[in-house]
């Protein structure tokens, strides 16, 4: 399984860097920061499906 380390999140602001990640909610997140913030908000229910766009 693919995974990312979200231990240093949430962060108050994310950069505009575009390195897309596909979440288990079938939504494409622009970068790791955006994805990890969403993971924290979901209380860990959101996981990474794959790197790249959904």
UniProtKB/Swiss-Prot annotation:
Which residues carry attached sugars according to the database record? Answer: 43
Q: List the disulfide bonds in this chain.
A: 6-36, 14-33, 22-54
- A GO MF label: serine-type endopeptidase inhibitor activity
- Source domain of life: Eukaryota
Query: Listed GO cellular component terms?
Result: extracellular space
Broad class of where this protein is predominantly found: secreted
Q: Which residues form the Kazal-like domain?
A: 4-54
Q: Where in the cell is it found?
A: Secreted
Q: Where is this site: Reactive bond 3?
A: 16-17
**InterPro entries named in the record:** Bifunctional_prot_inhibitor (IPR051597), Kazal_dom (IPR002350), Kazal_dom_sf (IPR036058), Prot_inh_Kazal-m (IPR001239)
Which SUPFAM superfamilies does the protein's record reference?
Kazal-type serine protease inhibitors
What does the UniProt keyword field contain?
A: Disulfide bond, Glycoprotein, Protease inhibitor, Repeat, Secreted, Serine protease inhibitor
Q: Quote the record's domain comment.
A: Avian ovomucoid consists of three homologous, tandem Kazal family inhibitory domains.
| Official protein name in the record | Ovomucoid
Which organism's genome codes for this protein?
Syrmaticus mikado (Mikado pheasant)
């Amino acid at each position: 399984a693919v995974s990312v380390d979200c231990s240093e999140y949430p962060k108050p602001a994310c950069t505009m860097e575009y390195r897309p990640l596909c979440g288990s909610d079938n939504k494409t997140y622009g970068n790791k920061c955006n994805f990890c913030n969403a993971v924290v908000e979901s209380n860990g229910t959101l996981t990474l499906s794959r790197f790249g766009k959904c």
